[in-house]
Structure formats: structure tokens, C-alpha cells
Amino acid sequence: MFNNDPLQKYDKELFDLLEKEKNRQIETINLIASENLTNTAVRECLGDRISNKYSEGYPHKRYYGGNDYVDKIEELCYKRALEAFNVSEEEWGVNVQPLSGSAANVQALYALVGVKGKIMGMHLCSGGHLTHGFFDEKKKVSITSDLFESKLYKCNSEGYVDMESVRNLALSFQPKVIICGYTSYPRDIDYKGFREICDEVNAYLFADISHISSFVACNLLNNPFTYADVVTTTTHKILRGPRSALIFFNKKRNPGIDQKINSSVFPSFQGGPHNNKIAAVACQLKEVNTPFFKEYTKQVLLNSKALAECLLKRNLDLVTNGTDNHLIVVDLRKYNITGSKLQETCNAINIALNKNTIPSDVDCVSPSGIRIGTPALTTRGCKEKDMEFIADMLLKAILLTDELQQKYGKKLVDFKKGLVNNPKIDELKKEVVQWAKNLPFA
């Protein structure tokens, strides 16, 4: 006995909210570097009846019956994950069950070092992730700085990773894991240099490639699999899949690591996996191996570099003065505005982006920059020529933010009053919506 009416009939209130969100996406210039659009096939997997099934354990070792097809789907996902990143099953294994990138990072770290083990990652203000051991002067912000003993390395004043500084910190701290791979670092990563440091202190090299995984799969950036012991990635960013994650582990270099990783995921941190997500990941990984996806990934990079050039041409300051990947960090200090205020202005005119720290920041709550990226816009068909319009709109938003701050004050609560019933906001929003609505949308 159950209700089998379609959502529009069964729950119109919820249906209307979902429709409004869809329309928001259609009418928005999405510059959030960690977002993308899934295709129809992936969305079909997410809504499939396979989500009815409970399947604690691993293929052919389940704690429930009736998992014959679930096993085959998970094995297919496993196979496609290795193929997507061109690594052999003899050398590498992969766990496809983590529910998210944060979960995958915690699970992998726990497997490698255990409670109170020493880890070393990049500071959040420099471009690291919360789960890389972040803490500040007031508290241990992430569970990874509480569960493990953490030290953080930083970028230099130009925004680049200083490998000598990383080495010196590693020699003094003697971590068991060094993490590279970041959330707002616009340059390629020296995995070979990190490997050499890890070997010097007898540490695992952990590469979190959540933001750049497609570039790795398509051989457009340095390859961490040559040097790393563990590689994690989300599947919903530039990979264009569902919100899930993968943990790769080098079992040839580290005998027994497969048992450590797998037992950390289940049963230490998770119970039954989300089978609909695993099916959706498998579906998207099939696309990753196609020439079509490689062309898409190349275009993301072309668009990002073009956007960076457009912004520099308009005299905006960029961290590291450009980008090697899909993301750009804009330094707003010369305009005397915060990323928080610009984010609010952009949100009011249907441009989605996020406030972001720059390397000189000490306050992560009110940062001096924004992070923007090109994956979602590229999925919607944008090319290099379109970056001129986007750069124009960003500059207009910056100048308007400065104007509103001078009129309404520096406090965010006061500043936001200037966004309401503002003809300039309405005019910019109309321009953005008209432009965005003409882009293809899945």
C-alpha cells in the first residue's frame, strides 16, 4: 500500500519549489567552481528503484540477501573508475561507496594513521579544504584536526605552494600523511616534489583531486597516480556526476592498504551504501572515457584561461596572476570590499559564486576574495568569446558593491539594505537572466 501519484499531483508545494530551483539554475550564470550539471541518464540512476535495496558490505560479501544485481553494478563502477583514470587493477584499487568527499577524506585518513595520527595539509586560507586538518586559533574547526594531530602549511605571498617550506615543516613535524590537492589553488601540483618529501619523512602521500579529477583523467594536468599512495575525488564537480566520492589506493606500493581503506569505509564509518549513487557514478564514468568528455574538459580549461585574461585586461587582481585549471581566485583588496559583499551583490543579479580567502587572509569568515570557475558554464555550451560578457558583469558587480558600501556602510547587514529595490540591481539582473536563458540546459 503506497501512493503512486507523480510529485506534481502528490505534493504540489514541494514540486513548485523544485521547479523554482530549476528555473533559478536556468536563469543564473553559475561560476561556482565546485558545481556542475548532471545529464539525464545520471539523474535517472539517482531516482531508480535500486535505492530501495540495502546492501551492507562489499560485492559477494553482503549482510543482506538479494544483492546479485547490486554486486554487478558496484563491480561495474569499480571497473570504470580504474579505466577512467587509466590505472591498472594490479597496482590500484578503489572504493566506490563513500557518500561524499568529506566522508572519503576522513575515512582514508583514519585508515592510514588512526586516531591521533599525524597529518599535514594546506591551510584553508591558502586553498586547502576543511578535511585536510583545518583548525584556527580559537578551535579545531574540522573533525580531522580533532581526530588527528594536524599541522598546516601555507602558500607564499604570491599564492604558490612553497615546497621548501613544506619540506621544513614535514621534517620538524614528522607527519604520517601529507595531503596535496586543494579547493581554491589555481595552479598545477608538484606531486613528484611531494613524493620526495614523503619519502624523506616516511609518510603517505594523499592527493585530493576533487576539483581537478577530469584534468587528471584527460591528461591535461600532472598525474598524482604516478606518485601518490591514496587519491580521493568527489564525482559531482568537474566529473559531472552525482554527489558522491571515490577513494583510490596503491595496493602494489602498500600491501594491505586495501583492507585498511575498505574496513574504514565499512563498517567503521558507514553502513549500507547508497546504491543509486553508485549506479549514477558508474553511468558518468562511462562518459569520462569518451572523446566527447575530453573535448568538454579541454574547453573548461580554455574558458578558464580566457576568463582570467579578460579579468586581467580589466585590471582585476588574481591570485598567482592567472590559472592552470578551472578556477580563478580574485583578490578584491584594492576595491576595499569583501568577498562576502560581492557574493551578495552577485546573488542579487543572478550570478552564483562564492566568497573565498586569499593567502594573506587571517579571517576565513570575512575573506578578501572570490572563487569562480568554468565547469558549469562550459557544460551549458559557453566558449572563450562568452568570457568577455562574464568579465564585464563581474566588474560591474564589483563597482556597484563599492558604491553601495560607501552609501550604506561596511557592516554586511547594512550593506544588504542597498540591494533591495535598487534599479541598478534590477537592470543588471535583467541583463544576466536574458543572457543565461539562451544557454542550453539539460
Curated annotation (Swiss-Prot):
Q: Where in the cell is it found?
A: Cytoplasm; Mitochondrion matrix; Plastid, Apicoplast; Nucleus
Q: How is the activity of this protein regulated?
A: Redox regulation; active in reducing conditions, inactive in oxidizing conditions. The reduction of the cysteine pairs allows the access binding of the tetrahydrofolate substrate to its binding site. This mechanism appears to be unique to Plasmodium species.
- GO molecular function per UniProt: glycine hydroxymethyltransferase activity; methyltransferase activity; protein homodimerization activity; pyridoxal phosphate binding
**Catalysed reaction, written as an equation:** (6R)-5,10-methylene-5,6,7,8-tetrahydrofolate + glycine + H2O = (6S)-5,6,7,8-tetrahydrofolate + L-serine
* Oligomeric and partner information: Homodimer.
Q: Which GO terms describe its cellular component?
A: apicoplast; cytoplasm; mitochondrial matrix; mitochondrion; nucleus
Query: Which cofactor(s) does the record list?
Result: pyridoxal 5'-phosphate
Which UniProt keywords are listed?
Apicoplast, Cytoplasm, Disulfide bond, Methyltransferase, Mitochondrion, Nucleus, One-carbon metabolism, Plastid, Pyridoxal phosphate, Transferase
- Protein name per Swiss-Prot or TrEMBL: Serine hydroxymethyltransferase
Task: Provide the disulphide bond pattern.
Answer: C125-C364
Which enzyme class?
transferase
Q: Which organism is it from?
A: Plasmodium falciparum (isolate 3D7)
PANTHER family (UniProt xref): SERINE HYDROXYMETHYLTRANSFERASE, SERINE HYDROXYMETHYLTRANSFERASE 1
Per UniProt, what is the name of the gene that codes for the protein in this document?
SHMT
Summary of the function given for this chain in its UniProt record: Catalyzes the interconversion of serine to glycine accompanied with the production of 5,10-methylenetetrahydrofolate, a source of one-carbon units used by thymidylate synthase to convert dUMP to dTMP for DNA synthesis. Binds to its own mRNA and to the mRNA of bifunctional dihydrofolate reductase-thymidylate synthase (DHFR-TS) in vitro; the physiological relevance of this interaction is not clear.
Tell me which residues bear N6-(pyridoxal phosphate)lysine.
Answer: K237
| One Pfam family from the record | SHMT
